[in-house]
Amino acid sequence: MNRILEGKKTAYYPTRSVFSLYKDGTYHVDWIYKSDQQTYAYDMPALNSSTRPPLSVPSKGFPRGAKVWSAKMGIGAGPVLIKDGMIRNSWVEELLDVASGINPQTCQPRSAIGITQDGKLILFVCEGREQTPDVPGMTLDQLARLMKAFGCVDALNLDGGGSSCMLINGKKTIKPCNKEHQQRPVATVLFAR
């Protein structure tokens, strides 16, 4: 990924977040990166910032705690909101700032997925941009705190904005944030039954 640093186009290599389902049936949030034909999961993100020179390319040795990512499947999104019970909100390290379209510090429609200590899957969506009066949406910090209040020990921000929508038995639960309140066509959806 490229960003402008001191007037020059600069390559960065951020670790990115994934909500993983492992073979033993457990869910976890991880930061991952594919290096040398192997995908590694990390306990911590590479501590990048678009205001500093880029860090090394993630590998087996960097950042610390690398292990082979052995999940059965995963949902890539970001940033991580909660990891191991701690609010992380790693949008700076994942370079998911205003330039990325995430708008982490402004109220926006948001979607998130999380897991509680006892294995309950939490799916969350909120509308925003005043589609309903006095409902501005949430910042990523507010979303992280809410997912923590729901009991999540791991949680991940999913695509928000006009992509935030939840249907239950075919019925919308919020007003999507376009003029017609219609669902935006998206390439990937999450189904639960």
Label every PLM stretch briefly.
Residues M1-R193:
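Gly/Ser/Thr/Pro-rich low-complexity, intrinsically disordered segments
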